[in-house]
Amino acid sequence: NCRDIGGYETRDGRKVQTGLIYRSGELPRLTDEDMEKLRALGVKTVVNFLTPEEVEYRGKDRLPEGVREIILPITGEIDDVPDAAAQLVEARKTGDFRKFPPAFNTQVHKDLVTGVADEQYSALFEILADKSNYPLVYHCSHGVHRTGTATALLLHALNVPWDTVRMDYLLSNETRRAEVEPRIEQLEGLAASRPMSDTDQKENSEAIRAFYLLQPDYIDASRDGAVEKYGSLDKYLEKGLGLNDLKIENLRDLSTAPQN
């Protein structure tokens, strides 16, 4: 699920530049061919949102020599699930997703913009404000919840329409299809061996599918959460992340350009 966020048109007729900013899922299992692709892209900086527990479970990022890695772990309590990232590591081991019902997926996106990840997202924007950090990759485990919300905030800051932001978010369903379908089957198989009633098995299967198959209301919940707390997404960027008009203008100058 690694892809360029560039190419999108902005409301003021500019275009997000390609070859500068990439969003991704985990990077520990890169093949030699993948490493060569990163080298060819000239990636200088990788921002990693994974927690220490996730890194222990998944492994450290495998990166070309000379790439700077910045660790900004996003953890915390989400939807009344203490230390949700660690709990998800366990769910992925056992196939038991009953602590993460379908409603979790909208709540996690809302929580990410109402306190859980403000410090990390603010730091990401500071990194993006420095041209010497480009080209840059930021990632979490699957490139979906934490990375998807970060991308939505970034594209919004670059003046990309929300319909386009939503489309980019849902694109992960296509880019991850070959990975997700067998993963769902594997998790359902793990869960089937656990002592659950038929009703619990059905609810657990629904939770697994809701977690791995993205819906538009997930990313809309990030926008709605910011609106509920701050009044607008722009106000969240300003008050929650410390992005004033000058910083946003600088970011747009760095990563958007007039269309030919």
Regions from the language model: what does each represent?
Residues 1-137, 142, 150-260:
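Cys-dependent protein tyrosine phosphatase-like superfamily
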